[in-house]
C-alpha cells in the first residue's frame, strides 16, 4: 500500500480521488484546459511516503509549463493549485478561518498592529469576505502577492490569505472614519475586485506594526556642509523604511567655485553625489535591495557635463556614481536655444542662487541679466551640442531622465506656496519642496541664546562688524561673552508620494468611475493621517499640502478589449474622455472631503481656490490633439469650480500616474499607461522563469495588442499629452525605440515634442530591441519597487 505524508506529518493511505478533486476544481469552467491533460502531463511518480507538498508542486509546475499564447488559462489553473496549497498552510483546510482568528493569530506573532480591530464589527465584516475572489489571480499575480505582500511569521511561514489581507488593509485605512464599517467595506470591495489598487508600500505595510505607507520622497539640498550632510541622514532614514528618493542638488556650488572667499576651492557637486551613492548602497532596505535615489540638477549648472557622465564606466572613478539615477531639470530657455542652435551659458549657483527659485519669464529675465554680468563666473557651450550629449547618453544608458521645469511649475496648483525643484525617482510626482534653512545660534556664557541669519551683519563690543557666521567664542556682544556659535536648521519641505491606481480594464464607464474614484481618493487621504513618517519634516510637509497621487493602469488591456488601436484617433478620444471623468470626480471628492474634514493648510490663494483646474492650464498644442479641445466637456466644470471655491479642497495635489508594474502584475492587467512588451514573455521570480501572456488574449483582442516597440514613440508622447491635460502632477512615461530605428534626429523629435506638448517629464528610454527568442525575459531590475 502506498502512503502519503501530509503537511502536519500524519501518514495516511494515498487516495487518488482527493487528487482528482483538486485537479477538477483547478480546471473547472476554464476554456482551453482539461483535468485529464493536467493529470497525464504531470507524470506523477507515486511512491511510498510521497509528500502531499511534492504532489502539489508537481501539479503547479505542470500547469505553469503549459501557459502559452493559445492556452493562457493554464495560468489560472496554476493559481488555483497554488491557492489550495496556501489555504492548507494558513488555515489547515481549503478555506478561510474567521476574521477574528486571523487577527488574533497575526497579533500574537507581532505582525499586525494591535488596537484597531476592536473598533470594528468583526462578525459583519467576516460575513462580507468573498473567498471566490481569490480565483481572479493568475499564477504570477498570486506568486507576487505571496512573495511580497502576504504576512509571514518569524519562520517565513504564511499567516495571511488574500481576502484577509484586503479586509485588514481596508479596516486599517478606515479606522478613523465615522461610519468605519461601511467605509472599510467600500475599501475592501474596490481592492478585492481589482477595480483599483494601492501602491506597494501601502499594500505591504498597512495593518502592520511598521505602517510606512508612502512610495517615495522628494527633497532638496542647500549649499552648506551642514545641510548637505543633514540631507544624507534624511535620505538614509527615508531609504531605511523603503522609500524611493528624488533629490535636488542644484543649489550646491559648482566645481571651481568660491569657498570662504577663495576662488577655485570647490570640488563641485560630484564628490557629494558620490557620498549619496554610498548612502543608497549602505542603507539597503532590510537587506532586500539597495536604496534607490534619483538626483536632479538644473541644466544651467556648471557641473552639468560631468553630471551627465555620472554613471559612465570610463573616466575618473572618484567622479562616478554608478548606483544613482541622474535627472536633468530642463528649462524652456534651454530648449529654445537648442532649436535656435544658439549658445548656452552655464553658471555657478553660489552666485546665481535665485535661478533655482524662478521659472518662466521671471527666470528668463534673470538668466539674461546674469549672462550680461561680467563679474559672474560662467562657461559657454553650444546648446545643441549639450542636447546631443544628453540624447546620446539617454540612448546608451536610458539616463539621465528629463524633467521640464517650466512645464511643471506653470501647472503647479500651489505655486503661491513655493516652487517645484525636481520630481521623484519615477518622474511622476511634482510638488513644492524646499531645502532646510540654516541660521546661527549664539549661546552666551550666562546661558542666554540669540539667533541671527548667517550673513546678518553684527557689530561686536570691540567695534568689529562681521557676518554672524564668523562670530566665535572670543567675541562679546552687548557685554555678553559668547560661549559657542553653532549653525542650526529650520526644516524645509520634503514632499511625499501616496499612490494608488484605478484599473482601467475594469473601470472604464462613467458610472464606474463615479463610484470608484471617490472611494480611492478617500482611501489615499486616510493614508496621510495613518502613515508612519520617518521624520518630522516629511510629516509636516504631507500634513501641509495633503498630497495624494491617484493614477491609472491597464490602459493597453482596456484598449484591446474595446478593439481600439494604440495611437489611433479613437485611442486619444477614449483616454481623453476617461481622464476627464477621473479628474472631475477626484476634484469633486476632495471638495466633498474638505467640507467633511477640513481644507488643506495651503488652500487659500492656491489655483484651486480661484477655481483654476489642471484643464484650465492645459497645453494649447495638446488641446488640439482631440476634437474636444477647450469645449465639449462632458462634466459640469463650472459647477465644480463654484463648489471648490465654497468648500475648499482637502488635497493640494491629487493625480499622478505611476509605473505600477508590481500591482498590475498582482491584478493581472497591463502595466500603467504603457503598451505591452510582447504578447508572451517571461518574468523572473524566486521560483524561476514564469511564462506570462497578456490578459484576455483572444481572436478579438489579438490585433489590438501591439508591442511598444512597434508603436511610433511620438504616439506615446501624444497620448501622454492628452492625459496630462487632466492631471495636476505628472506621468511616468517610458519611451520605446528599436535600435535600428534610433537616430539623433529621431530622439530630438521625440523629446522636443514631449516638451512642446506640455509633458513634465520622461522616464527611461528603452532602446534595446526585444529578443526574437521565445524566452524573452522582461528586465525589471531598473524599476522603482515603491511606486509600483
UniProtKB/Swiss-Prot annotation:
Any GO CC annotation of this UniProt entry? ribonucleoside-diphosphate reductase complex
- Reply yes or no: does the keyword Oxidoreductase apply: yes
Report the record's disulfide bonds: 216-497
Q: EC number(s) on record?
A: 1.17.4.1
Q: For this UniProt record, give its keywords in alphabetical order, as a comma-separated list.
A: Allosteric enzyme, ATP-binding, Deoxyribonucleotide synthesis, Disulfide bond, Nucleotide-binding, Oxidoreductase
Q: Please list the GO terms describing molecular function.
A: ATP binding; ribonucleoside-diphosphate reductase activity, thioredoxin disulfide as acceptor
Residues given in the record as ATP binding sites: 6, 12-18, 52
Report if keyword Methyltransferase is assigned.
no
Q: Where is this site: Interacts with thioredoxin/glutaredoxin?
A: 784, 787
Activity control, per UniProt = Under complex allosteric control mediated by deoxynucleoside triphosphates and ATP binding to separate specificity and activation sites on the alpha subunit. The type of nucleotide bound at the specificity site determines substrate preference. It seems probable that ATP makes the enzyme reduce CDP and UDP, dGTP favors ADP reduction and dTTP favors GDP reduction. Stimulated by ATP and inhibited by dATP binding to the activity site.
Q: Where does dTTP bind?
A: 223-225, 253
- Provide a GO biological process annotation: deoxyribonucleotide biosynthetic process
Q: Which InterPro entries match?
A: ATP-cone_dom (IPR005144), NrdE_NrdA_C (IPR013346), RNR_lg_C (IPR000788), RNR_lsu_N (IPR013509), RNR_R1-su_N (IPR008926), Rrm1 (IPR039718)
Q: Please describe the quaternary structure of this protein.
A: Tetramer of two alpha and two beta subunits.
The record's comment on protein family reads: Belongs to the ribonucleoside diphosphate reductase large chain family.
Which function does this protein serve?
A: Provides the precursors necessary for DNA synthesis. Catalyzes the biosynthesis of deoxyribonucleotides from the corresponding ribonucleotides.
Q: What is this protein called in UniProt? A: Ribonucleoside-diphosphate reductase subunit alpha
UniProt source species: Helicobacter pylori (strain J99 / ATCC 700824)
Q: What is the lineage of its organism?
A: Bacteria, Pseudomonadati, Campylobacterota, Epsilonproteobacteria, Campylobacterales
Amino acid at each position: 500500500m502506498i502512503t502519503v505524508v501530509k503537511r502536519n506529518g500524519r501518514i495516511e493511505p494515498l487516495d487518488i480521488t482527493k487528487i482528482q478533486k483538486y485537479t477538477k476544481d483547478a480546471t473547472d469552467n476554464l476554456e482551453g484546459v482539461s483535468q485529464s491533460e493536467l493529470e497525464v502531463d504531470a507524470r506523477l511518480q507515486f511512491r511510498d511516503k510521497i509528500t502531499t507538498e511534492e504532489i502539489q508542486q508537481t501539479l503547479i509546475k505542470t500547469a505553469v509549463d503549459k501557459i502559452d499564447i493559445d492556452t493562457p488559462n493554464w495560468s489560472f489553473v496554476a493559481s488555483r493549485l497554488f491557492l489550495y496549497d496556501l489555504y492548507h498552510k494558513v488555515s489547515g483546510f481549503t478555506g478561510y478561518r474567521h476574521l477574528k482568528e486571523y487577527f488574533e493569530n497575526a497579533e500574537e506573532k507581532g505582525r499586525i498592529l494591535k488596537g484597531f480591530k476592536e473598533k470594528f464589527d468583526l462578525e459583519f465584516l467576516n460575513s462580507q469576505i468573498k473567498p471566490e475572489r481569490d480565483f481572479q489571480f493568475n499564477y504570477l499575480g498570486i506568486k507576487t502577492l505571496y512573495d511580497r505582500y502576504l504576512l509571514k511569521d518569524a519562520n517565513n511561514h504564511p499567516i495571511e490569505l488574500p481576502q484577509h489581507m484586503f479586509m485588514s488593509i481596508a479596516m486599517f485605512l478606515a479606522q478613523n472614519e465615522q461610519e468605519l464599517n461601511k467605509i472599510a467595506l467600500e475599501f475592501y470591495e474596490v481592492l478585492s475586485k481589482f477595480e483599483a489598487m494601492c501602491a506597494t508600500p501601502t499594500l505591504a505595510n498597512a495593518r502592520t506594526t511598521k505602517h510606512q505607507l508612502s512610495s517615495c520622497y522628494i527633497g532638496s539640498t542647500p549649499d552648506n556642509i551642514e545641510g548637505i550632510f543633514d540631507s544624507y541622514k534624511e535620505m538614509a532614514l527615508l531609504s531605511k523604511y523603503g522609500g524611493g528618493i528624488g533629490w535636488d542638488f542644484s543649489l550646491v556650488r559648482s566645481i571651481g567655485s568660491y569657498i570662504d572667499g577663495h576662488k577655485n576651492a570647490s570640488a563641485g557637486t560630484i564628490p557629494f553625489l558620490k557620498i549619496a551613492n554610498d548612502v543608497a548602497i549602505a542603507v539597503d532596505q532590510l537587506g532586500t535591495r539597495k536604496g534607490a535615489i534619483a538626483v536632479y540638477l538644473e541644466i544651467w549648472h556648471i557641473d552639468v557635463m560631468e553630471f551627465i557622465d555620472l554613471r559612465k564606466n570610463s573616466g575618473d572613478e572618484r567622479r562616478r556614481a554608478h548606483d544613482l539615477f541622474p535627472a536633468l531639470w530642463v528649462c524652456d530657455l534651454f530648449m529654445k536655444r537648442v532649436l535656435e542652435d544658439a549658445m548656452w551659458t552655464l553658471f555657478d549657483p553660489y552666485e546665481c542662487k535665485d535661478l533655482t527659485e524662478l521659472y518662466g519669464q521671471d527666470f528668463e529675465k534673470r538668466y539674461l541679466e546674469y549672462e550680461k554680468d561680467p563679474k559672474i563666473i560662467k562657461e559657454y557651450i553650444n546648446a545643441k551640442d549639450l542636447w546631443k550629449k544628453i540624447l546620446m547618453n539617454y540612448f546608451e544608458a536610458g539616463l539621465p531622465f528629463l524633467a521640464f521645469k517650466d512645464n511643471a511649475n506653470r501647472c503647479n496648483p500651489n505655486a503661491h506656496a513655493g516652487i517645484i525643484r525636481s520630481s521623484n525617482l519615477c518622474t511622476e510626482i511634482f510638488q513644492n519642496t524646499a531645502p532646510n534653512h540654516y541660521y546661527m545660534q549664539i549661546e552666551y556664557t550666562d546661558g542666554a541664546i540669540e539667533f541671527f541669519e548667517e550673513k546678518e551683519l553684527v557689530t561686536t563690543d570691540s567695534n568689529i562688524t562681521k557676518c554672524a557666521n564668523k562670530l566665535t567664542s572670543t567675541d562679546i556682544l552687548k557685554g555678553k561673552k559668547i560661549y559657542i556659535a553653532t549653525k542650526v536648521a529650520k526644516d524645509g519641505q520634503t514632499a511625499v508620494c501616496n499612490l494608488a491606481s484605478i484599473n482601467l480594464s475594469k473601470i472604464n464607464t462613467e458610472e464606474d468611475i463615479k463610484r470608484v474614484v471617490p472611494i480611492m481618493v478617500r482611501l489615499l487621504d486616510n493614508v496621510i493621517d495613518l502613515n508612519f513618517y520617518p521624520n518630522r519634516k516629511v510629516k509636516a510637509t504631507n500634513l501641509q499640502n495633503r498630497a495624494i497621487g491617484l493614477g491609472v493602469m491597464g490602459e493597453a488591456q482596456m484598449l484591446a478589449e474595446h478593439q481600439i488601436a494604440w495611437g489611433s484617433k479613437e485611442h486619444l478620444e477614449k483616454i481623453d474622455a476617461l481622464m476627464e471623468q477621473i479628474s472631475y470626480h477626484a476634484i469633486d471628492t476632495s471638495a466633498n472631503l474638505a467640507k467633511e474634514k477640513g481644507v488643506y493648510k495651503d488652500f487659500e490663494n492656491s489655483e484651486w481656490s480661484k477655481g483654476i483646474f489642471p484643464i484650465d492650464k492645459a497645453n494649447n498644442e495638446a488641446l488640439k490633439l482631440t476634437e474636444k479641445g477647450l469645449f465639449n466637456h462632458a462634466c459640469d466644470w463650472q459647477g465644480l469650480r463654484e463648489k471648490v471655491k465654497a468648500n475648499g479642497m482637502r488635497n493640494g495635489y491629487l493625480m499622478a500616474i505611476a509605473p505600477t508594474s508590481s500591482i498590475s502584475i498582482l491584478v493581472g492587467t497591463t502595466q500603467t499607461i504603457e503598451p505591452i512588451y510582447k504578447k508572451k514573455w517571461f518574468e523572473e521570480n524566486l521560483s524561476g522563469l514564469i511564462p506570462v501572456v497578456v490578459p484576455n488574449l483572444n481572436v478579438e483582442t489579438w490585433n489590438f495588442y501591439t508591442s511598444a516597440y512597434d508603436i511610433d514613440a511620438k504616439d506615446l508622447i501624444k497620448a501622454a499629452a492628452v492625459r496630462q491635460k487632466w492631471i495636476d502632477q505628472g506621468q511616468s512615461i517610458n519611451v520605446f525605440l528599436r535600435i535600428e530605428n534610433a537616430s539623433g534626429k529621431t530622439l530630438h523629435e521625440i523629446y522636443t515634442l514631449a516638451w512642446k506638448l506640455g509633458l513634465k517629464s520622461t522616464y527611461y528610454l528603452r532602446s534595446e530591441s526585444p529578443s526574437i527568442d521565445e524566452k524573452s525575459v522582461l528586465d525589471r531590475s531598473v524599476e522603482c519597487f515603491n511606486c509600483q
